[in-house]
Design a protein with these regions (language model features):
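N-terminal pre-Walker A segment at the start of P-loop NTPase domains
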Residues: 312-331
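Divalent-cation
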Residues: 178-210, 215-218
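Extended, charged alpha-helical coiled-coil/arm scaffolds that mediate oligomerization and mechanical coupling
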Residues: 72, 122-193, 224-285
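Charged, amphipathic alpha-helical linker segments immediately N-terminal to NTP-binding catalytic cores
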Residues: 292-318
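P-loop NTPase switch/communication element
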Residues: 366-406
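Conserved amphipathic alpha-helical "coupling/scaffold" segments
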Residues: 1-155, 159, 163, 269-272, ...
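Conserved small/polar residues in nucleotide/adenosyl-binding loops
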Residues: 413-420
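P-loop NTPase nucleotide-binding module
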Residues: 327-380
Length: 424
């Protein structure tokens, strides 16, 4: 049926996987996860997850800090005149460093003394990372622009360095002038001893009582909410404060120029960079599947390129998680179906577990063919089916039961019209 995933509970699996993703990159991959009937593809996906389980359990240095999705920003700068702002550039640098570090981690080799050659501890993941482009020159270029906190460096350009030096010099000059004026006003008793210069509307000013504001020549910029203080910009520093405003405008324009120039340089590389982020998305997705497998004690059973079920102690993962909250355990399931024994009839009383059994088979088989490990004994064998059909009604009331029963012949007709020996 069209609501097959809801019938077997796979929609809940997707939801749980999304919760384990580090970014929207991985979440999109969860949405795109699809059933496959190709043995090599399924086997490779399972191997990737099993290798990542080992990474989680055995490695402490896997680089997973910065899974930022900067694809929208990269796509935006394809348009002439658009540029990455400071935060976007910071996210780009950190995520590119993460991609670089992951590729290094997965493509490293160890010496095999018996084979007298170098081998990879994670061959399936190494194959995934093998052709991924990293961008060391781009990272270096960003490092020349941003400091370690993601702020534009003073020396990002010679012009910016000049502007910021003049800003520092002018601000220092204003502070010295204000302090001299303030000390004089304090000695005359116009201003309290504990008063210090403050900032109002981007200008350095002195707080003064309203009744004494004429004692200091200057411009009144603001007053406190209580009306007990006015903020005066002394006439001696007005011109210097104006220069500060001019320099701040120059600084903003120079930063935009730097960011625009960088974006122009990056623009031709955007398609290749986006491809590397697809790799980051895949790693996020595989990691989420590995985390879920660890949580549910899932393994990769012996995968066979034929239609067979030979499962030992198989467990419904959603039921397992639900019961674990109440310190209860699932009753495991053993089942065997093959080309000789192709039909299995399950009978029993109401609430005897028949529906759970059917859903367990459907869900676990679907999970495997979506590249997910499943909770069962490692000696289990699991095959591959072209299609999975299910006709199951959730019993809610007498009326619903009748309508559900009457729908069975329709479902059977559809099944008979489409089934093959390759289906479950």
């Amino acid at each position: 049926p069209q609501n097959f995933e809801q019938k077997i509970g796979f929609d809940s699996i997707r939801h749980l996987l999304k919760g384990k993703c580090l970014s929207t990159l991985g979440e999109e991959r969860v949405d795109e996860m699809a059933f496959s009937e190709k043995y090599e593809e399924i086997n490779e996906r399972l191997e990737q997850v099993m290798e990542f389980i080992r990474i989680i359990q055995e490695e402490d240095e896997f680089p997973d800090q910065y899974f930022f999705d900067v694809r929208p920003s990269l796509k935006r700068i394809r348009i002439e005149g658009m540029y990455l702002d400071e935060q976007e550039l910071f996210d780009l640098r950190r995520s590119l460093e993460t991609i670089r570090d992951i590729v290094r981690f997965l493509t490293r080799t160890t010496e095999d003394e018996e084979m007298e050659e170098s081998t990879s501890p994670y061959p399936a993941l190494k194959r995934l990372a093998g052709d991924i482009i990293v961008f060391p020159q781009l990272i270096t270029r960003i490092n020349n622009i941003l400091d370690k906190f993601g702020k534009i460096k003073d020396n990002a350009s010679s012009e910016l360095l000049r502007i910021r030096r003049e800003l520092t010099s002018t601000t220092g000059s204003i502070s010295r002038s204000l302090n001299a004026i303030l000390r004089n006003a304090q000695s005359e008793g116009y201003v309290d001893k504990d008063v210090t210069p403050t900032m109002r509307d981007g200008r350095l000013v002195i707080p003064v009582a309203p009744g004494l504001k004429r004692k200091i020549k200057g411009i009144v910029h603001d007053e406190s909410s209580t009306g007990k203080t006015v903020f005066i910009e002394p006439a001696e520093v007005v011109e210097a404060n104006n220069r500060i405003r001019e320099l701040e405008g120059e600084e903003r324009r120079e930063i935009i120029r730097i960011l625009t120039d960088f974006s122009i340089t990056v623009r031709p590389q955007v398609p290749a960079i986006l491809q590397s982020y697809e790799f980051l998305a895949e790693i996020d997705f595989i990691r989420a599947k590995a985390q879920f497998a660890i949580q549910t004690n899932a393994i990769k059973p012996s995968l066979e390129n034929k239609q067979v079920l030979d499962w030992r102690t198989a467990i419904h993962p959603l039921l397992q998680l639900s019961l674990a909250k109440h310190n209860k355990k699932v009753v495991p399931l053993d089942i065997e179906l093959n080309y000789k024994q192709r039909i299995l009839i399950i009978s029993g009383p109401n609430a005897g577990g028949k529906s759970v059994c059917l859903k367990t088979v459907g869900l676990l088989q679907y999970m495997v063919q979506c590249g997910m490990p499943v909770p069962m004994h490692e000696r289990s064998h699991i095959g591959i089916f072209s299609n999975i059909f299910i006709d199951i009604g959730d019993e809610q009331s007498i009326e619903d039961d009748l309508s559900t029963y009457s729908s069975h012949p329709v479902s059977y007709t559809h099944l008979r019209a489409h089934e093959t020996v390759l289906d479950l």
